[in-house]
Every structure is written in C-alpha cells, then in structure tokens.
Amino acid sequence: YALMDGERIVGNAFIYNWIGEKDFVKIMNLAVHPEYRRRGFAALLLDHVTNEMRAFNPPRFCGETRASNLGMQRAFEKCGYRLNRIEPDYYQNPNESAYKYVLKL
C-alpha cells in the first residue's frame, strides 16, 4: 500500500496475509516520510490496511515496533491494537526491545 501526496509516495505499508497458514494478518512494515510525520498519517495508513484486510476475516492482526518508536506505538493504539508483549533484545543495531501489538477481531 502507498500513501500518496500527488504523485509522490509519502508513506507505505507492507502486510502479509497468513490466513490459511497461521490465521492472522501481519503488518510487516509501515513507514511515513519524515516531512509527513506527526500528522496522523501512520495511523491513517494502518487503519486503511486493517480495514482492507478485514475482508479476509482474520481473527487477529499483528505488528511490532521498536521500544523507541513512540509514534508507531501511538498509531497502533489509536487504531485499536493492544500491546501483547515486550520482547527484549529483539532488534539489533542498536540493540532494542520490540513492542508486539495485536488487534483481535
């Protein structure tokens, strides 16, 4: 998915539909160009892809972010996702915990 401003891509989301294999949709990556951050675009994009994937009737959506990425944490929470667990030392360079979110339907 792409978030556009005219012909310019200013955000994107990559998802994986695990329905039939593991019965969830995974938010693999979601990014917004630095010039467009702190305007609610991450939540807008996350809400859009979540609503699009509802057509597949997944029991849950999953996603994660770095402990330091407060903006993405707010986007998850704004869209109804709840912190499911914190996984220490999940990311490297720099070493950081992952905040794992889930939205159950």
Enumerate the predicted regions with their spans.
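Structural motif
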Residues: 56, 78-79
